[in-house]
Protein backbone atom coordinates (compact mmCIF):
# COMPACT_ATOMS: atom_id res chain seq x y z
CA UNK A 1 0.00 0.00 0.00
CA UNK A 2 1.41 3.38 -0.87
CA UNK A 3 -0.39 5.21 1.91
CA UNK A 4 1.59 6.32 4.97
CA UNK A 5 -0.61 5.91 8.02
CA UNK A 6 -0.44 7.64 11.38
CA UNK A 7 -1.45 6.91 14.95
CA UNK A 8 -3.65 10.00 14.88
CA UNK A 9 -5.62 8.59 11.97
CA UNK A 10 -6.07 5.27 13.71
CA UNK A 11 -7.15 6.98 16.93
CA UNK A 12 -9.81 8.89 15.02
CA UNK A 13 -11.08 5.69 13.44
CA UNK A 14 -11.21 3.84 16.73
CA UNK A 15 -13.02 6.73 18.37
CA UNK A 16 -15.70 6.51 15.72
CA UNK A 17 -15.84 2.74 16.02
CA UNK A 18 -16.35 2.95 19.79
CA UNK A 19 -19.76 4.47 19.14
CA UNK A 20 -20.95 1.25 17.47
CA UNK A 21 -24.30 0.30 18.97
CA UNK A 22 -26.27 -2.91 19.18
CA UNK A 23 -28.69 -1.44 16.65
CA UNK A 24 -25.84 -0.77 14.25
CA UNK A 25 -24.83 -4.42 14.35
CA UNK A 26 -28.12 -5.22 12.61
CA UNK A 27 -27.17 -3.28 9.48
CA UNK A 28 -25.59 -5.15 6.58
CA UNK A 29 -24.78 -3.41 3.27
CA UNK A 30 -26.99 -4.92 0.58
CA UNK A 31 -25.29 -3.46 -2.49
CA UNK A 32 -22.04 -1.82 -1.36
CA UNK A 33 -20.84 0.88 -3.71
CA UNK A 34 -17.94 3.32 -3.79
CA UNK A 35 -17.94 6.41 -5.97
CA UNK A 36 -14.49 7.39 -7.22
CA UNK A 37 -14.78 11.11 -8.16
CA UNK A 38 -12.41 10.77 -11.13
CA UNK A 39 -11.78 8.63 -14.18
CA UNK A 40 -10.22 5.15 -13.84
CA UNK A 41 -6.52 4.97 -13.04
CA UNK A 42 -6.26 7.77 -10.49
CA UNK A 43 -5.84 7.85 -6.74
CA UNK A 44 -9.55 7.91 -5.93
CA UNK A 45 -10.16 4.96 -8.22
CA UNK A 46 -7.28 3.08 -6.59
CA UNK A 47 -8.61 3.84 -3.10
CA UNK A 48 -12.12 2.58 -3.83
CA UNK A 49 -10.95 -0.59 -5.56
CA UNK A 50 -8.23 -1.48 -3.06
CA UNK A 51 -10.43 -0.87 -0.02
CA UNK A 52 -13.36 -2.74 -1.55
CA UNK A 53 -11.17 -5.75 -2.36
CA UNK A 54 -9.54 -5.75 1.07
CA UNK A 55 -12.88 -5.50 2.89
CA UNK A 56 -14.10 -8.57 1.01
CA UNK A 57 -10.84 -10.50 1.43
CA UNK A 58 -11.01 -9.94 5.19
CA UNK A 59 -14.62 -11.07 5.37
CA UNK A 60 -15.81 -7.60 6.36
CA UNK A 61 -18.05 -7.50 3.29
CA UNK A 62 -19.81 -10.54 1.91
CA UNK A 63 -20.52 -8.88 -1.43
CA UNK A 64 -18.28 -7.21 -4.00
CA UNK A 65 -18.13 -3.44 -3.69
CA UNK A 66 -19.09 -1.85 -7.00
CA UNK A 67 -16.85 1.05 -8.02
CA UNK A 68 -18.45 3.84 -10.03
CA UNK A 69 -16.28 6.54 -11.61
CA UNK A 70 -17.92 9.96 -11.57
CA UNK A 71 -15.41 12.56 -12.72
CA UNK A 72 -15.65 16.31 -12.95
CA UNK A 73 -15.08 19.54 -11.09
CA UNK A 74 -12.28 18.25 -8.88
CA UNK A 75 -14.75 16.01 -7.07
CA UNK A 76 -17.61 18.49 -7.31
CA UNK A 77 -19.74 16.45 -9.71
CA UNK A 78 -19.68 13.44 -7.38
CA UNK A 79 -20.35 15.63 -4.34
CA UNK A 80 -23.43 17.18 -5.97
CA UNK A 81 -24.65 13.74 -7.06
CA UNK A 82 -24.47 12.42 -3.51
CA UNK A 83 -26.05 15.50 -1.93
CA UNK A 84 -28.88 15.85 -4.45
CA UNK A 85 -29.67 12.28 -5.48
CA UNK A 86 -28.11 9.79 -3.04
CA UNK A 87 -28.50 11.60 0.29
CA UNK A 88 -30.03 8.67 2.19
CA UNK A 89 -28.13 5.76 0.60
CA UNK A 90 -26.83 3.52 3.38
CA UNK A 91 -24.76 1.36 1.02
CA UNK A 92 -22.68 4.18 -0.44
CA UNK A 93 -19.17 5.40 0.29
CA UNK A 94 -17.40 8.14 -1.65
CA UNK A 95 -13.66 8.54 -2.07
CA UNK A 96 -12.40 11.64 -0.27
CA UNK A 97 -9.06 13.37 -0.06
CA UNK A 98 -7.44 16.75 0.47
CA UNK A 99 -8.85 17.97 -2.86
CA UNK A 100 -12.59 18.05 -2.04
CA UNK A 101 -11.93 19.38 1.45
CA UNK A 102 -9.81 22.17 -0.04
CA UNK A 103 -12.35 22.94 -2.75
CA UNK A 104 -15.20 23.07 -0.23
CA UNK A 105 -13.22 25.45 1.97
CA UNK A 106 -12.63 27.62 -1.11
CA UNK A 107 -16.35 27.66 -1.91
CA UNK A 108 -15.55 26.02 -5.23
CA UNK A 109 -18.53 23.62 -5.16
CA UNK A 110 -21.38 26.09 -5.89
CA UNK A 111 -24.31 25.60 -3.53
CA UNK A 112 -22.57 22.89 -1.52
CA UNK A 113 -21.06 22.93 1.96
CA UNK A 114 -18.98 20.53 4.02
CA UNK A 115 -21.83 19.69 6.42
CA UNK A 116 -24.02 18.18 3.70
CA UNK A 117 -22.28 14.81 3.99
CA UNK A 118 -21.00 12.62 6.83
CA UNK A 119 -17.20 12.43 6.90
CA UNK A 120 -16.38 8.83 7.65
CA UNK A 121 -12.68 8.04 7.90
CA UNK A 122 -9.16 8.75 6.74
CA UNK A 123 -7.12 5.68 5.86
CA UNK A 124 -3.73 7.31 5.45
CA UNK A 125 -1.57 9.83 3.66
CA UNK A 126 -0.57 9.52 0.02
CA UNK A 127 2.54 11.58 -0.64
CA UNK A 128 2.69 13.81 -3.67
CA UNK A 129 5.09 13.23 -6.55
CA UNK A 130 6.42 15.10 -9.55
CA UNK A 131 7.14 12.87 -12.53
CA UNK A 132 8.18 13.05 -16.17
CA UNK A 133 7.97 10.63 -19.09
CA UNK A 134 10.57 7.87 -18.97
CA UNK A 135 12.34 9.26 -22.04
CA UNK A 136 12.26 12.89 -20.88
CA UNK A 137 15.50 14.87 -20.94
CA UNK A 138 14.59 16.38 -17.56
CA UNK A 139 16.71 14.62 -14.93
CA UNK A 140 15.57 16.03 -11.60
CA UNK A 141 13.25 18.46 -9.84
CA UNK A 142 15.61 21.46 -9.75
CA UNK A 143 16.09 21.19 -13.52
CA UNK A 144 12.33 21.21 -14.08
CA UNK A 145 11.78 24.12 -11.71
CA UNK A 146 14.63 26.10 -13.26
CA UNK A 147 12.93 25.74 -16.65
CA UNK A 148 9.68 26.98 -15.14
CA UNK A 149 11.47 29.86 -13.42
CA UNK A 150 13.24 30.90 -16.63
CA UNK A 151 10.20 30.61 -18.91
CA UNK A 152 6.91 29.51 -17.29
CA UNK A 153 5.26 29.13 -20.69
CA UNK A 154 7.76 26.44 -21.74
CA UNK A 155 6.53 23.82 -19.28
CA UNK A 156 3.02 22.43 -18.85
CA UNK A 157 2.32 20.37 -15.74
CA UNK A 158 -0.66 17.99 -15.72
CA UNK A 159 -2.61 16.89 -12.67
CA UNK A 160 -5.80 15.08 -11.80
CA UNK A 161 -7.43 17.80 -9.71
CA UNK A 162 -9.11 21.03 -10.75
CA UNK A 163 -7.27 24.34 -10.87
CA UNK A 164 -6.78 25.33 -7.24
CA UNK A 165 -7.05 21.70 -6.15
CA UNK A 166 -4.42 19.63 -4.39
CA UNK A 167 -2.45 18.47 -7.45
CA UNK A 168 -2.20 22.09 -8.56
CA UNK A 169 -1.12 23.22 -5.09
CA UNK A 170 1.67 20.64 -4.96
CA UNK A 171 3.51 22.04 -7.96
CA UNK A 172 2.95 25.58 -6.66
CA UNK A 173 4.43 24.60 -3.28
CA UNK A 174 7.52 23.22 -5.03
CA UNK A 175 7.83 26.24 -7.32
CA UNK A 176 7.52 28.65 -4.41
CA UNK A 177 10.14 26.73 -2.41
CA UNK A 178 12.51 26.91 -5.38
CA UNK A 179 12.13 30.67 -5.66
CA UNK A 180 9.68 31.14 -8.52
CA UNK A 181 8.50 34.68 -7.80
CA UNK A 182 5.03 34.55 -9.34
CA UNK A 183 3.66 31.02 -9.01
CA UNK A 184 0.48 32.13 -10.75
CA UNK A 185 2.45 31.88 -14.00
CA UNK A 186 3.07 28.15 -13.53
CA UNK A 187 1.22 26.45 -16.37
CA UNK A 188 -1.01 23.79 -14.80
CA UNK A 189 -3.48 21.76 -16.87
CA UNK A 190 -6.28 19.95 -15.02
CA UNK A 191 -7.64 16.54 -16.01
CA UNK A 192 -10.34 14.30 -14.55
CA UNK A 193 -8.03 12.04 -12.57
CA UNK A 194 -4.37 11.13 -12.41
CA UNK A 195 -4.69 8.37 -14.99
CA UNK A 196 -5.83 10.82 -17.66
CA UNK A 197 -3.10 13.28 -16.66
CA UNK A 198 -0.41 10.61 -17.10
CA UNK A 199 -1.90 9.64 -20.46
CA UNK A 200 -1.41 13.24 -21.63
CA UNK A 201 2.16 13.18 -20.32
CA UNK A 202 2.92 10.05 -22.34
CA UNK A 203 1.31 11.62 -25.41
CA UNK A 204 3.73 14.53 -25.16
CA UNK A 205 0.98 17.09 -24.54
CA UNK A 206 2.61 18.16 -21.26
CA UNK A 207 6.14 17.97 -19.87
CA UNK A 208 5.49 16.91 -16.28
CA UNK A 209 2.91 15.30 -14.00
CA UNK A 210 1.96 16.14 -10.44
CA UNK A 211 -0.09 13.65 -8.48
CA UNK A 212 0.17 11.07 -5.73
CA UNK A 213 2.38 8.05 -5.31
CA UNK A 214 -0.52 5.60 -5.46
CA UNK A 215 -1.60 6.75 -8.91
CA UNK A 216 1.96 7.07 -10.25
CA UNK A 217 3.25 3.69 -9.05
CA UNK A 218 1.66 1.56 -11.77
CA UNK A 219 3.07 3.78 -14.51
CA UNK A 220 6.52 3.63 -12.89
CA UNK A 221 6.35 -0.16 -12.76
CA UNK A 222 5.39 -0.31 -16.44
CA UNK A 223 8.38 1.87 -17.35
CA UNK A 224 6.26 4.73 -18.70
CA UNK A 225 7.24 7.49 -16.27
CA UNK A 226 10.04 8.51 -13.90
CA UNK A 227 9.40 10.03 -10.50
CA UNK A 228 11.83 12.93 -10.09
CA UNK A 229 10.65 13.92 -6.61
CA UNK A 230 8.52 12.68 -3.76
CA UNK A 231 7.07 15.40 -1.53
CA UNK A 232 7.77 13.56 1.73
CA UNK A 233 9.94 14.70 4.66
CA UNK A 234 12.39 11.85 4.06
CA UNK A 235 12.83 8.93 1.69
CA UNK A 236 10.11 6.33 1.91
CA UNK A 237 10.99 2.74 2.69
CA UNK A 238 10.81 -0.48 0.72
CA UNK A 239 9.91 -0.36 -2.96
CA UNK A 240 9.84 3.45 -2.91
CA UNK A 241 13.32 3.95 -1.47
CA UNK A 242 14.83 4.76 -4.88
CA UNK A 243 12.67 7.87 -5.27
CA UNK A 244 14.50 11.04 -4.19
CA UNK A 245 12.62 13.57 -2.10
CA UNK A 246 12.31 17.20 -3.12
CA UNK A 247 13.97 18.17 0.14
CA UNK A 248 17.18 16.22 -0.54
CA UNK A 249 17.39 18.02 -3.89
CA UNK A 250 17.35 21.37 -2.13
CA UNK A 251 13.64 22.10 -2.58
CA UNK A 252 11.89 22.22 0.79
CA UNK A 253 8.47 21.08 -0.40
CA UNK A 254 6.25 18.58 1.42
CA UNK A 255 2.78 17.54 0.33
CA UNK A 256 0.75 14.69 1.81
CA UNK A 257 -2.72 14.02 0.46
CA UNK A 258 -4.95 12.35 3.04
CA UNK A 259 -7.30 9.77 1.57
CA UNK A 260 -10.47 8.32 2.98
CA UNK A 261 -14.23 8.41 2.58
CA UNK A 262 -17.36 10.39 3.21
CA UNK A 263 -20.92 9.09 3.29
CA UNK A 264 -24.28 10.61 2.31
CA UNK A 265 -25.59 13.17 4.76
CA UNK A 266 -28.78 11.21 5.33
CA UNK A 267 -27.08 7.88 6.03
CA UNK A 268 -28.59 6.32 9.16
CA UNK A 269 -26.58 6.26 12.38
CA UNK A 270 -26.70 2.46 12.32
CA UNK A 271 -25.22 2.26 8.81
CA UNK A 272 -22.65 4.97 9.54
CA UNK A 273 -21.41 3.19 12.66
CA UNK A 274 -21.09 -0.11 10.81
CA UNK A 275 -19.09 1.47 7.99
CA UNK A 276 -16.79 3.20 10.49
CA UNK A 277 -16.27 -0.12 12.26
CA UNK A 278 -15.52 -1.98 9.02
CA UNK A 279 -12.98 0.59 7.83
CA UNK A 280 -11.40 0.67 11.30
CA UNK A 281 -11.02 -3.13 11.29
CA UNK A 282 -9.52 -2.96 7.81
CA UNK A 283 -7.07 -0.25 8.86
CA UNK A 284 -5.88 -2.27 11.85
CA UNK A 285 -5.41 -5.51 9.91
CA UNK A 286 -2.03 -6.99 9.02
CA UNK A 287 -3.32 -7.59 5.50
CA UNK A 288 -3.91 -3.87 4.97
CA UNK A 289 -0.53 -2.90 6.36
CA UNK A 290 1.14 -5.38 4.01
CA UNK A 291 -0.60 -4.29 0.79
What is each of the regions a protein language model found here?
Residues 1-10:
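Bacterial N-terminal signal peptides that target proteins for export
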Residues 9-19:
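Bacterial N-terminal signal peptides
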Residues 24-116, 163, 180-208, 286:
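N-terminal (or domain-start) structured segment
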Residues 71, 153-154, 159-243:
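Ligand-binding pocket segment of bilobal, Venus flytrap-like solute-binding proteins
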Residues 91-94, 111-130, 156-158, 248-252:
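A structural signal for short loop-to-beta-strand junctions that line the ligand-binding cleft
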Residues 132-153, 269-270:
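Flexible hinge/capping segments at coil-to-helix
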Residues 139, 215-287:
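C-terminal lobe and pocket-closing loops
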Residues 149-154, 280-291:
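Periplasmic-binding protein-like
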Amino acid sequence: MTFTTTRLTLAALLLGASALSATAQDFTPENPECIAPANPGGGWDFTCRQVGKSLQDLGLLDKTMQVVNLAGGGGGVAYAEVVNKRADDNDLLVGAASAPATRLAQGAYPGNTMDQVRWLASIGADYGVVAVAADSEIDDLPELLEMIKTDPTSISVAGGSAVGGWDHLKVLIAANAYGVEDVRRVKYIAFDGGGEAVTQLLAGSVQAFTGDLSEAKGFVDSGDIRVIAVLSPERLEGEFSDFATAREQGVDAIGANWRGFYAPGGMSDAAYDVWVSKVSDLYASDEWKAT
